[in-house]
């Protein structure tokens, strides 16, 4: 074999060697990308699960959420403390505690909306908020979701799947002063039903003989 032939063979062999290296690099890169994507997916899924838990709200927005977590973790039938620091005879009068017992979380009621969360985040960072936060009506609670009917905050397919007519029948046992009979117009659910403090029978503002459910407050007592 001449010198030229030997050089040609060497050149061919030299040119053939990089190909496997390139393939190996691509394989390693592919494996790395798969691992990175897998980690991101798992981390993202874990974050979403944590995001829906009450301790997420408390961990991220430490100060404004501090008064709320105990009302959620309280045990119905036992004394508790409401978000204002008032003693509550029975935590069962606070809907946050009741909802916790059936597996509901903060996000089941307070469905997160990006623009609303951004506004709240800015208020938290700037310190421009009240603590505890002001109480909002059902209308205000569904406003960010674009819902026109505030009843949907409570009466929907995943929570209380019935309308006001059926609701009125469910409380017929309360007699002539049935809080769900619209003799004075339809009231918002949140007028009586409170999540983070003892619920109130608003009817007792005028009807002092109205039935006050166990552990609830009369209108007068709620103002003390």
Predicted regions and their residues:
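Short sequence/structural segments immediately N-terminal
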Residues: 2-224
């Amino acid at each position: 074999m001449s010198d030229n032939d030997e050089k040609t063979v060497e050149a061919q062999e030299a040119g053939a060697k990089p190909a496997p290296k390139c393939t190996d690099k691509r394989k390693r890169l592919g494996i790395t990308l798969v691992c990175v994507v897998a980690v991101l997916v798992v981390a993202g899924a874990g974050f979403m699960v944590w995001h829906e838990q009450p301790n997420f709200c408390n961990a991220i927005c430490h100060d404004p959420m501090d008064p709320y977590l105990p009302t959620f973790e309280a045990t119905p039938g036992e004394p508790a403390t409401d978000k204002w620091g008032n003693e509550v005879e029975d935590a069962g009068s606070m809907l946050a505690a009741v909802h916790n017992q059936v597996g509901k979380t903060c996000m089941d009621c307070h469905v997160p909306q990006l623009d609303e969360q951004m506004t709240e985040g800015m208020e938290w960072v700037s310190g421009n908020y009240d603590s505890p936060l002001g109480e909002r009506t059902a209308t205000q609670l569904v406003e960010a979701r674009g819902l026109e009917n505030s009843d949907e905050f409570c009466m929907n397919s995943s929570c209380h799947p019935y309308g006001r007519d059926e609701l009125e029948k469910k409380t017929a046992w309360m007699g002539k002063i049935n809080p769900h009979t619209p003799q004075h117009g339809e009231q918002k659910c949140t007028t009586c039903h409170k999540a983070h403090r003892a619920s109130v029978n608003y009817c007792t503002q005028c009807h002092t003989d109205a039935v006050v459910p166990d552990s609830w407050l009369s209108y007068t007592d709620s103002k003390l």
